[in-house]
């Protein structure tokens, strides 16, 4: 038998849970707890679904209404309660409370209504929950690590009372760049919790084997610093050597206690995200979802477009409008796939044109960041290109001269893909691939309806934000959303199943290709990315492909004979276990 753990609530209840609940070989839960204590543990509590026999053995008689309901009946009632909430923030709070009251029921409800509830537990509503975190705070969830107490990091992990094999996945954020809303300090724990909920709903990652972590290094958000109810560190955000030492202490402690765990980084600032990737990506099992996850799902859209047009990835010319971490992360993954298709890395780099607030990035521009350097254009190559009053090569001139086949926006500049620019691109490409990736919706570089109109319906689109179908010339076009939820759950599950030591470029490419393979290429109007209704199906295929790629790359410590079965066996499902009184 082994301990059965929950990481949604770290409190005194945790110690009760750890000391008094065990999972039997048959999959039952065995406990010494009785009465109200049983009802207080979210992994143990079934509410009115406890059988009459369980109620007698566990001391629950008289503590519950007499009727026994099934999990399905409970889920029906919970859905009615969810629908009765006045807005999405209240729905988020309701689901959070449910998760901390009855974990199985929460995931059953989420699985039953994934399309409707994913935007509530994850982006965009989780952004509202993060902003209101200190005012909506009810109970601790996860691990809170403070830069002002580096020496306490190991103690925090020790306080979980978990063994080395108990944890598969840790999602951590320093909250500097939360979604599209910026720096929100300790409230960023909610993005880690939301991410883990998606891991479980999409890929069946066991919720008892994960930990959400917030790395509290302070905040530069004046609203939080001036808020008397703010519960995070009330000082400006720490950077530099002290920040790096804090991150290093976290990584060392996490892997000391849980050496096989996948470390997922979420919503770090650009500079820190890149530095952490550079330091750890080739040493441990880790990835940054904002950079590498976004790159994988965008690459999936590109590969699906190639399948639709019959074109080769290595022949594409790509303009990236927004050369920050996300934009360059996308470029890196497309570039790596071009290399796998036969180009040299130098040849592949030359297929890209990257822009930021300085216009086209060229070798003679000062202040270029290291991660941007592979894609700089030679100054002599563009010496005759038109420049604006600042001496910069503007976006419209890049499109005119480079004649891109793929246009990707990660700028957060609403409406940047103007009619003039889009029509210029469409004039030299049979099927322009245009991907306005910025989110939320009001920051998108273009709206799909305009893109169809400006290209006479030739465009192939994927977006970063959700958009309704577009009706054009009698066809309803589904707009595929480049939602990282299609990528990171399966990537994580596949890495865990293979016990991968690191995540290789081929594993990211396998993620993208598996997603692209799930796209409907035959139905008129089908999107470049799968429907969210296929999220679990996609995640399973991604996990299989990732595990196989890890084995092929020689980075897997486990090589199951039947990878598909190993993936399916590893998936947790929201079903009540029999609870036995010990």
From Swiss-Prot:
Comment on bound cofactor: Divalent metal cations.
UniProt source species: Bacillus subtilis (strain 168)
Pfam families: malic (PF00390), Malic_M (PF03949)
Catalytic residue list: 122, 195
Physiological role: Catalyzes the decarboxylation of malate to pyruvate. Can use NAD and NADP, but with a strong preference for NAD. Can also catalyze the decarboxylation of oxaloacetate. Involved in keeping the ATP levels high.
Induction line: Induced in the presence of malate via the two-component system MalK/MalR. The regulator MalR binds to the promoter region of maeA. Is not subject to carbon catabolite repression.
SUPFAM superfamilies, A to Z: Aminoacid dehydrogenase-like, N-terminal domain (SSF53223), NAD(P)-binding Rossmann-fold domains (SSF51735)
PANTHER family xrefs: MALIC ENZYME-RELATED (PTHR23406), NAD-DEPENDENT MALIC ENZYME, MITOCHONDRIAL (PTHR23406:SF34)
Essential cofactor(s): Mg(2+); Mn(2+)
Alphabetical list of InterPro entries matching this protein: Aminoacid_DH-like_N_sf, Malic_enzyme_CS, Malic_N_dom, Malic_N_dom_sf, Malic_NAD-bd, Malic_OxRdtase, NAD(P)-bd_dom_sf
Family: Belongs to the malic enzymes family.
Chain sites annotated for binding NAD(+): 323-326, 439, 484
Record-level Gene Ontology MF annotations: malate dehydrogenase (decarboxylating) (NAD+) activity; malic enzyme activity; metal ion binding; NAD binding; oxaloacetate decarboxylase activity
Keywords: Magnesium, Manganese, Metal-binding, NAD, Oxidoreductase
Reactions catalysed, as given in the entry: (S)-malate + NAD(+) = pyruvate + CO2 + NADH; oxaloacetate + H(+) = pyruvate + CO2
Keyword Metal-binding: yes
Disruption phenotype: Mutant can use malate, succinate plus glutamate or glucose as efficiently as the wild-type strain. The ATP concentrations in the mutant grown in minimal medium with glucose are similar to the wild-type level. ATP concentrations decrease by about 10% in malate minimal medium. The mleA-maeA-malS triple mutant shows a decrease in ATP concentrations by about 20% and a moderate growth defect. NADPH overproduction is roughly halved in the deletion mutant.
Binding site for a divalent metal cation: 266-267, 290
EC nos: 1.1.1.38
Gene Ontology biological process terms from the UniProt entry: malate metabolic process; pyruvate metabolic process
Name of protein: NAD-dependent malic enzyme 2
